Amino acid sequence: EPFWAAVRAKFRLNPDYVNLENGYYCFQPEEVLEQFVGHVRRVNFLGSRYMRTVKDEDKDRVRRRLATLAGCGPDELIITRNTTESLDTVITGFQWSAGDEAVMAHQDYGAMLDEFRLMARRWGVVNRYVDIPRNPASDDEVVQLYANALTSKTRLLMIPHLVNITGHVLPVRAICDMAHARGVPVLVDGAHAFAQLDYRIADLHCDYYGASLHKWLSA
């Protein structure tokens, strides 16, 4: 199709194979790559002067533009290296006590499950798992699945916005509203939703949201 041919022309791709994995690391369009390399050259040209006098202004400008794209306030957005670092910051920042419970799915990203296992070893956190069905009858079934896992000891619920191994898009807002009615904050893994789905973080009603720019945004 002419449209996709025009999109493909924006990228310089290896002709020896067809890449089918953009969710791990996506190519940058040539125009974006040129801007990226130009920025690196600019930082290298200015050296310490950039780090001491220009960096914060650049970072603040980027944060404001990202906040507009994400649908949140710039004061709510922190720039990290990736989704894993963002979610880890929240998980390890909780004041956990022995016996506290965290709820998550077997389908959550492995690095995040590992972080909760670390919390279990370090603080005695009890991890409770749900199994998201491949073909749920409705969104209500998924919401109820998480609702059944919450107890009076639940301190945090983690959910994927888009399950990376199945492509299932969860009813995030409905899950968040259910959890909040029970006094449970919600952490959302949005690594594969950001720039792929049309939404505003503020409309999801979540407490924490982590995403990456090197995946579907092609940044």
Question: What do the predicted segments below correspond to?
Answer:
Residues 1-219:
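Pyridoxal 5′-phosphate
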